[in-house]
């Protein structure tokens, strides 16, 4: 079966429009990664930019350096996972298979 080049171009235009819409939706995403019962929280946007890091000072004095570094790493990884999940949910069914 032959592919009509005009149909292909129409589909590409639709894909570009979908990608533009996804980019807009991604810019609206904000998640909060947490670690250590909220001792460390990291706010991240849909483009994986860290917007805010919060440390509960009440517990900070009791932490050693290794524990604190582990909590920051865990909170950051939690935020990244949440952004990926939001992107997955927002793009489900929007992009053609394989993109």
Swiss-Prot record:
It is found in: Cytoplasm, Nucleoid. Its main location: cytoplasm. It comes from the Bacteria. One of its GO terms (cellular component) is cytoplasm. SUPFAM superfamilies: YbaB-like. InterPro entries: YbaB-like_sf, YbaB/EbfC. Keywords: Cytoplasm, DNA-binding. One of its GO terms (molecular function) is DNA binding. Gene3D superfamilies: Nucleoid-associated protein YbaB-like domain (3.30.1310.10). Homodimer. Binds to DNA and alters its conformation. May be involved in regulation of gene expression, nucleoid organization and DNA protection. Belongs to the YbaB/EbfC family. This is Nucleoid-associated protein EbfC. The gene is ebfC.
């Amino acid at each position: 079966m032959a592919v009509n080049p005009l149909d292909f171009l129409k589909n590409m235009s639709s894909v570009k429009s979908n990608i533009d819409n996804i980019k807009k939706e991604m810019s609206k995403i904000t998640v909060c990664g947490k670690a250590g019962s909220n001792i460390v929280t990291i706010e991240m946007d849909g483009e994986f930019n860290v917007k805010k890091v919060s440390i509960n000072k009440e517990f900070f004095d009791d932490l050693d350096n290794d524990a604190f570094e582990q909590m920051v790493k865990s909170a950051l990884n939690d935020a990244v996972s949440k952004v990926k999940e939001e992107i997955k949910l927002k793009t489900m069914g929007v992009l053609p298979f394989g993109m």
